[in-house]
């Protein structure tokens, strides 16, 4: 039985698997199969919109979701793939997630922000799969009565997403003696707000 406030949104451009023959012989786990995405959650009681998708993110949609006549400030944050990490040229990032847990964690973060900052709405979208340089991996939009709580909520939600949400990324590098495709898996929490590493890295050649 579906929770009365839990209303899945329908994406107009769903991702369709392109290799049905290979997937039938060696099926991917459900949470790693792009054909099972986007996965979205909408909680009408707090105007919360959550999304995990393999499609490019749509900042205009994120802002439209949170607009409210009671909001005096709308803040949008876009996290993009930068061209270097630790002075090494980056080819791309690849994100993976365990969606059932990740969506529950995102809901907890969003509800906490709504309560703490009296938000009129919040939208959190995270892209999965390959995200190339200058493309967006996360979009966070918040609406509040005034600019100060909107700014603070946006930053706090971002930091909590990086610290707690069950999403992992692989950084693939080029040049500097490394062939394209060399990379490292790490949790989002492994880098701080300045892009510096925290803790040990898990290397993959």
UniProtKB/Swiss-Prot annotation:
GO terms for molecular function: molybdopterin synthase activity. Its EC number is 2.8.1.12. Residues 1-36, 179-205 are annotated as: Disordered. GO terms for biological process: Mo-molybdopterin cofactor biosynthetic process. It is found in: Cytoplasm. Pathway: Cofactor biosynthesis; molybdopterin biosynthesis. InterPro entries: MoaE_sf, MOCS2B_euk, Mopterin_biosynth_MoaE. Pfam families: MoaE. One of its GO terms (cellular component) is molybdopterin synthase complex. Heterotetramer; composed of 2 small (MOCS2A) and 2 large (MOCS2B) subunits. Catalytic subunit of the molybdopterin synthase complex, a complex that catalyzes the conversion of precursor Z into molybdopterin. Acts by mediating the incorporation of 2 sulfur atoms from thiocarboxylated MOCS2A into precursor Z to generate a dithiolene group. This is Molybdopterin synthase catalytic subunit. It comes from Ajellomyces capsulatus (strain NAm1 / WU24) (Darling's disease fungus). The lineage of its organism: Eukaryota, Fungi, Dikarya, Ascomycota, Pezizomycotina.
């Amino acid at each position: 039985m579906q929770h009365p406030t839990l209303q899945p949104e329908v994406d107009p451009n769903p991702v369709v698997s392109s290799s049905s023959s290979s997937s039938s012989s060696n099926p991917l786990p459900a949470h790693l199969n792009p054909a099972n995405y986007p996965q979205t959650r909408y909680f009408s009681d707090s105007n919360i919109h959550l999304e995990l998708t393999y499609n490019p993110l749509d900042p205009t949609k994120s802002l439209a979701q949170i607009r409210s006549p009671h909001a005096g400030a709308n803040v949008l944050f876009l996290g993009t793939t930068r061209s270097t990490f630790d002075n090494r040229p980056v080819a791309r990032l690849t994100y993976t997630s365990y969606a059932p847990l990740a969506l529950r964690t995102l809901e907890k973060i969003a509800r906490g922000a709504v309560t703490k900052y009296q938000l009129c709405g919040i939208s959190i979208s995270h892209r999965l799969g390959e995200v190339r340089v200058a493309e967006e991996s996360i979009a966070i939009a918040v609406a509040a009565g005034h600019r100060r709580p909107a700014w603070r909520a946006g930053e706090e939600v971002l930091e909590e997403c990086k610290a707690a949400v069950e999403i992992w990324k692989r950084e693939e590098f080029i040049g500097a003696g490394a062939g394209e495709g060399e990379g490292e898996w790490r949790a989002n929490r492994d880098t701080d707000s300045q892009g510096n590493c925290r803790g040990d890295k898990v290397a993959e050649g």
